[in-house]
Amino acid sequence: MILFGSILFGQTNFYLGADLSYVNEVEDAGAIYRYQKKKIDPYQLFAQKKCNLVRLRLWHQPSHSSYSNLADVTKSIQRAKKQGMQVLLDFHYSDTWADPEKQYIPKAWSEISDLKILGDSIYQYTYKTLEHLFRLKLLPEIVQIGNETNSEILQPEGKHAEKINWERNAFLLNQGLLAVKDFNEKHQTNIQRMLHIAQPENALWWFEEAHQNGIENYEWIGLSYYPLWSKYTMEQLPEALSILKEKYQKEIMIVETAYPFTLTNIDKANNILNEKALLPEFPCSPEGQKKYMISLVNQAIKGGAKGVIYWEPAWVTSNAHTLWGRGSHWDNATFFDSSNQNEALPVFDFFNPKNYLFQTN
């Protein structure tokens, strides 16, 4: 059965989402968002435009920022739920960015040498976080156990595991997955679990090795897909998604992607997506950005995926500081034009289900 232009989750099982982790911080640092020249709450705007899933990163005890900790994430979940959007909570299991290049252990756990105690730390932290949100009636619909865990998790600061010790890695990841399972059983809830790998070519080998080492109890495979860092073209993407879906019998979601609408840098913070991120078929323009997103969603649907999330579409320039400078490293790839008072851009139309043909199960 094909449904045209419908996205009610539960009928078509498709998410069109946004990672809004930076919103609280940039608003506190002076950012104002506009739609048709009028000030607007960004959460209200995303919901109004039919965004149905908000992704939020959670750091353990960040020392470089007072955001993306549990208090900040709790506030963000409240904002998302108030607007009727579902939530994907992204546990980084780190005090800072966890990604393919670094998976640094939280400082509070850094002296733990006993693997069982370390695993229990993941379990208790995950479980207690969900208990906190449960008491506030703010449970996420999906929980991500780790962020871009291409390499081995919980490594000493400054070190990168060149080769994954799967006995250790599988035990630790399974403890996070088990915490969600046990929480669901106790509270009769149905929080879904996701594992997340950057780039489809890496997911193909990583999930094979994970499966061989006993990591099986999860519902979602999450992928980052940035053409700048992937060997796969957009046209090749459906094949990889189909392989992952059929081989492991999991739902698939692209949880990170982005495309620039300009190469102009509005502030002194360098922009991560430069001319090397451009694709010939998608101009570096507001319409080109929109075309990229709609094309990507259609390819994701073709591959059997059940969702696409844009990474940090509201990380506009502000007086906020990052580890690398003041401003935004993403201002040319947001859904707002910082050179025009943060006016909303045409790419918001990517949330419009009328752009897609959704196939139901």
State where each predicted segment sits.
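Bacterial Sec-dependent N-terminal signal peptides
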Residues: M1-T12
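Short, well-ordered coil/turn segments that N-cap beta-strands
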Residues: T12-L16, K50-N52, K81-V87, L136-E141, ...
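N-terminal substrate-binding region of glycoside hydrolase catalytic domains
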Residues: T12-Q86, S94-S121, G222
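Conserved, mostly hydrophobic/aromatic
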Residues: A18, F46, D90, V143, ...
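Aromatic-rich peripheral "rim/lid" segments of glycoside hydrolase catalytic domains that contact
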Residues: A31-R34, I243, T264-S295, Q299, ...
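Glycoside hydrolase catalytic-domain groove-lining segments
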Residues: I40-A47, K181-Q192, E201-A277, I294-I301
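Active-site cleft segment of glycoside hydrolase catalytic domains centered on the general acid/base Glu
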Residues: N69-D72, D99-Q212, E216-Y218, S230-E239, ...
